[in-house]
């Protein structure tokens, strides 16, 4: 396993972050694994040297946090970097169970700690931008969480670059904790973050932890085969349909074909080529890889060993055309 520090912090993380959205309960999404099925994957990740785990309170309505916490309880907590997120509605009857107000952050942080069975969260991230709460209120609540030793670092996810710049400026102006990481939507078939967000992160020393580096599985197998998978069928009539549509549009299908071609040339899987491309980006610290299979997890780790040439990178990138901004909702 390769390791790096997260942004300008001194915290060391594995270059592969295990995404835990697929662990929890199939009552939430049909492709999600329960604890018994999830445990071997998380344990294998630790065996492979992964020390960075990302979840969110909303994943499986909290069950993902509980599953992750139960498995990690069998290991040395100090050796793991645990990240979770807050923003989305957790209780239909409680309007304060969503957003980024002080009240929401305080109560949802305690709920996450309880489900994880931990005293401190290493990286507590805001899941989306809250248009109803001043960023200063959010930052003060997060600052207080760090002072109370409930949280070590704060991060954020999926927003406009001007919003992120506002947040960083507010932290500096008020002497509050700064966001140290950006979890954003970035892969070979969705590169809009290269325009403003990634240069901003590089300039400000913010760690980049991309979600969906394999385009929700679209870059793991040929286009037509993907549409026949459970997730491919699921996307056609779901909340994620707009995302797979943008992957297929404006050069995406051709990029999928080129990933398949290079995978054959290198004697590796399509997923490994797509992930190697993300890992070759200097601004990226650790892509978040979600999986329901130990084999696929091992494939992801092996992608660290793939050396793509400049011509390979150019060949993969050349068909890309701009698409609408996606993932900020």
Whereabouts are the PLM-identified features?
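Active-site beta-loop-alpha junctions enriched in small/polar residues
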Residues: 21, 56-58, 85-89, 126-129, ...
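N-terminal binding-site loop/beta-alpha segment at the start of enzyme catalytic domains
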Residues: 1-80
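Structural motif corresponding to the early beta-alpha repeats
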Residues: 75-99
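Acidic (Asp/Glu)-rich catalytic clusters
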Residues: 8, 47, 69-81, 113-117, ...
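Beta/alpha (TIM)-barrel catalytic core signal, keyed to glycine-rich beta->alpha loops juxtaposed to Asp/Glu
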Residues: 133-318
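Short, acidic/polar
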Residues: 32-45, 100-116, 164-169
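Active-site groove signature of glycoside hydrolases
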Residues: 113-132
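Active-site mouth loops of central-metabolism enzymes
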Residues: 23-36, 92-103, 127-132
């Amino acid at each position: 396993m390769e390791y790096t520090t997260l942004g300008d912090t001194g915290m060391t993380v594995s270059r592969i972050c295990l995404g835990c959205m697929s662990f929890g309960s199939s009552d939430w999404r049909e492709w999600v694994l329960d604890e018994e099925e999830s445990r071997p994957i998380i344990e294998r990740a630790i065996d492979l040297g992964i020390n960075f785990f990302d979840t969110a309170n909303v994943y499986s309505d909290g069950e993902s946090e509980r599953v992750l916490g139960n498995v990690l309880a069998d290991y040395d907590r100090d050796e793991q970097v645990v990240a979770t997120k807050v923003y989305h509605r957790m209780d239909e009857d409680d309007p304060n169970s969503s957003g980024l107000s002080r009240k929401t952050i305080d109560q949802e942080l305690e709920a996450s700690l309880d489900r994880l069975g931990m005293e401190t969260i290493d990286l507590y991230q805001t899941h989306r931008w809250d248009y109803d709460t001043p960023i200063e209120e959010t930052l003060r609540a997060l600052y207080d969480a760090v002072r109370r030793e409930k949280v070590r670092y704060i991060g954020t996810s999926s927003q406009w670059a001007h919003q992120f710049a506002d947040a960083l400026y507010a932290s500096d102006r008020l002497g509050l904790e700064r966001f140290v990481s950006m979890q954003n939507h970035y892969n070979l078939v969705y590169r809009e973050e290269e325009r403003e967000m990634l240069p901003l992160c590089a300039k400000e020393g913010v760690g980049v932890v991309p979600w969906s580096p394999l385009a929700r599985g679209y870059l793991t197998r040929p286009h037509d085969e993907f549409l026949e998978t459970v997730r491919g069928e699921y996307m056609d009539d779901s909340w994620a349909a707009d995302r797979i549509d943008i992957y297929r549009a404006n050069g995406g299908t051709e990029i999928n074909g080129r990933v398949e071609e290079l995978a054959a040339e290198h004697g590796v899987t399509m997923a490994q080529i797509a992930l190697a491309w993300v890992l070759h980006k200097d601004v990226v610290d650790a892509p978040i890889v979600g999986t329901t299979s130990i084999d696929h997890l091992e494939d992801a780790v092996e992608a660290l060993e793939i050396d793509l040439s400049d011509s390979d990178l150019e060949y993969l990138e050349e068909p890309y055309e701009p698409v609408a901004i996606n993932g900020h909702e």
